[in-house]
Amino acid sequence: AAARAGAGRLASEANASLTAILFSVLTISSLILPIILGLLFDLSAANEEFIRDLFMHTLRSFIIMAVMINVLLTVSQRKSEVVSASNWFMFMALASFIFGSQFRFFGELANSTQTVWLGERMSQSWTIIALIFAVAYHVVPRAASRPIWSDSMTKASLLLLFFTLPPFMLSPADAGMLLENLGAILMTVALLPILAGSVNILMTSLGNATGVVSRPGALAATLA
């Protein structure tokens, strides 16, 4: 999506390949390295968890920073003056993963369950939903050969999503009554941008349902 929005190719293909390899290596290392070090040295459970968090959160977030720089450089080469909704969702998804991963790592160090909980919402809920919308807002209008149905709903889904807390993949956290009530309100309101984006994409696809159904990627994005 970023390449199509730019000059038809990524600003750096080498960057994309290298970051993909490093991301996979870090993910595998975070699972295997604590076990190997635990066999070689007398590591406590806390030290093993620290190593795992270091690889899973902090180091991987640096890899995503390189991805984000590549995406920004690619989009800067675009022919039109308008940055598409798909690219905005992609920017926000990458930024959410970067900051959320840091929140989770330092929250674990400080033993702050509230910081870890917020980091999980950023790196999981915000990131995943934003990436789904990024793909859908790029693929569906092209498959339907129609513009996005409602610009207002696009802006609503983009802005409100990152001011609320999507109620997905939740985990327990210690908090006072005020924070619990505030969290419940934000999780309830979070359904609005998701519904707005879903309706917007669905109505766009109905403009040319045959074209969307004939393309598996567009159909999958619509159903997602």
Regions found by a protein language model. Give the residues of each.
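Alpha-helical transmembrane segments of polytopic membrane proteins
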Residues: 1, 52-63, 117-130, 181-194
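Catalytic cores of extracellular degradative/oxidative enzymes
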Residues: 97, 124, 139
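General N-terminal targeting signals
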Residues: 54-57, 135, 141-142, 165-166, ...
